[in-house]
A protein has these predicted regions:
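Walker A (P-loop) phosphate-binding motif
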Residues: 1-32
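Short, charged/polar "capping" segments at the starts of alpha-helices
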Residues: 13, 41-44, 81-84, 106-113
Length: 133
């Protein structure tokens, strides 16, 4: 299982949140061996450049780490970037059918494909809603 932590390295609490996530991931995926990959980029105002830097729109032949992930922990608010929210909802949530997490999000996170919603705040992590239906 390839897990990508993707976000802004200068955000307060980022390292603490990543550590917290590493502790809870075995509980989210108890039957799988967890292989963690990581990708961190500083903020870019141009979302196209941000996606290119993230390896999503990289030149042919380069590994697209974000698109090969089974789980992505996002450490920024997608609505802050032009087109970023639709990118995650359409390409990651709908097409990839991957678990969908936010870290340090403002507002209510979207549920993942199992209707689970996770919330990571500075110093703590928890499942804020679970709907088994």
């Amino acid at each position: 299982m390839n897990i990508v932590f993707w976000g802004e390295t200068h955000r307060s609490g980022t390292t603490a949140n990543y550590t917290a996530m590493a502790g809870i991931l075995p509980h989210l995926c108890p039957d799988r061996k967890i292989v963690c990959g990581s990708l961190q980029r500083e903020r870019c105002e141009d979302s196209a450049l941000f996606l290119w830097d993230a390896g999503v729109c990289s030149p042919a032949g380069q590994k697209k780490l974000l698109l090969t992930a089974d789980l992505v922990v996002v450490n920024f608010e997608p609505q802050d970037y032009d087109g970023m929210e639709q990118f995650f909802l359409r390409h990651m949530y709908l097409e990839k059918r991957m678990v969908y997490l936010y870290a340090n999000c403002i507002g209510t996170p979207e549920p993942d494909v199992l209707n689970r919603v996770y919330r990571v705040d500075e110093g703590q992590i928890g499942i804020v809603r679970y709907n088994a239906a």
